[in-house]
């Protein structure tokens, strides 16, 4: 009997100790029952680190305009009035384009500096430029007249060619760039946006076949785009070469404004020249390899010589 009593006592004590331990642990895990340990953050100064050389990804790009932008006939509403959901893309772009004796196209192959020229003209005139497209990136960073295709804007951006493409326009500025550079610029845009870059790995996808096909397709498009507008557009046309715009910016802007029959404001023009780099001209980046093979470069240069000759451009 005494042995059984001790066994009963031992089992009871074990159960009591177990229950007590469970209760103790439960009380310690109740939220707020004990102070929270401070979180030690390594390199805690980094979240507040900002440098103009290394902008944070979420940092909003801002443009200093020489003058508040407006439409040709009315002041521009506040930028905050523009919301992406206010815009609807027409099912037929040509239906939104109305032929006008005042409508001027800014035609170019993608990667030829169209956005940069629009930026320069907005700086030099204070007038908005439009587009047949609705690029939300541009819409939010200095081009609120994206998808405006009427004479309320200075000119209208297009990368299209063919009868329907030029029918609404009375005049056109054709911006032409060296195809070798334009194709790389377009490759960068498709991979990294208007001011970004394609990673080196992108050129080597599928053992380089993707890049080779890209060059072949875009070279044909470059030739068709430029010759189609230069030969078949029946309105007044002015050909502007990107290299001239880079090296003789003021001279070219004056000539463009004269073609547009828009009076030159000397103060605005000086301001535009001072701020000509802006944020829409992609900075140069040297690759550690040449993306063009000898055969590709020979093909590109051959087509360039033909097109430039037909456009009246003499290459030295």
From Swiss-Prot:
Its main location: membrane. It is found in: Membrane. It is a single-pass membrane protein. Keywords: Glycoprotein, Membrane, Transmembrane, Transmembrane helix. Glycans are attached at residues 78, 150, 226, 232. The chain crosses the membrane at residues 8-28. Belongs to the WSCD family. This is WSCD family member GA21586.
């Amino acid at each position: 009997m005494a042995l059984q009593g001790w066994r009963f006592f031992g089992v009871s004590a074990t159960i009591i100790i177990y229950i007590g331990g469970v209760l103790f642990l439960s009380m310690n895990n109740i939220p707020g029952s004990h102070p929270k340990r401070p979180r030690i953050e390594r390199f805690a100064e980094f979240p507040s680190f900002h440098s103009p050389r290394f902008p944070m990804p979420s940092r909003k790009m801002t443009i200093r305009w020489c003058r508040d932008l407006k439409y040709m006939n009315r002041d521009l509403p506040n930028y905050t009035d523009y919301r992406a959901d206010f815009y609807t893309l027409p099912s037929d772009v040509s239906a939104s384009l109305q032929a006008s004796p005042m409508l001027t196209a800014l035609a170019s192959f993608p990667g030829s500096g169209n956005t940069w020229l629009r930026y320069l003209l907005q700086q030099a005139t204070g007038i908005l430029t439009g587009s047949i497209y609705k690029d939300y990136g541009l819409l939010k960073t200095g081009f609120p007249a994206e998808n405006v295709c009427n004479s309320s804007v200075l000119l209208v951006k297009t990368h299209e060619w063919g009868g329907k493409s030029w029918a609404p326009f009375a005049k056109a500025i054709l911006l032409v760039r060296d195809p070798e550079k334009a194709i790389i610029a377009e490759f960068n845009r498709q991979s990294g946006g208007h001011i970004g870059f394609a990673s080196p790995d992108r050129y080597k996808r599928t053992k380089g076949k993707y890049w080779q096909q890209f060059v072949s397709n875009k070279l044909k498009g470059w030739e068709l785009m430029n010759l189609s507008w230069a030969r078949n557009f029946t309105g007044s046309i002015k050909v502007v070469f990107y290299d001239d715009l880079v090296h003789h910016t003021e001279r070219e802007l004056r000539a463009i404004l004269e073609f547009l029959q828009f009076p030159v404001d000397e103060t605005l023009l000086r301001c535009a020249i001072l701020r000509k780099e802006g944020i829409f001209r992609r900075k140069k980046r040297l690759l550690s390899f040449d993306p063009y093979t000898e055969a590709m470069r020979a093909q590109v240069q051959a087509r360039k010589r033909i097109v430039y000759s037909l456009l009246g451009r003499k290459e030295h």
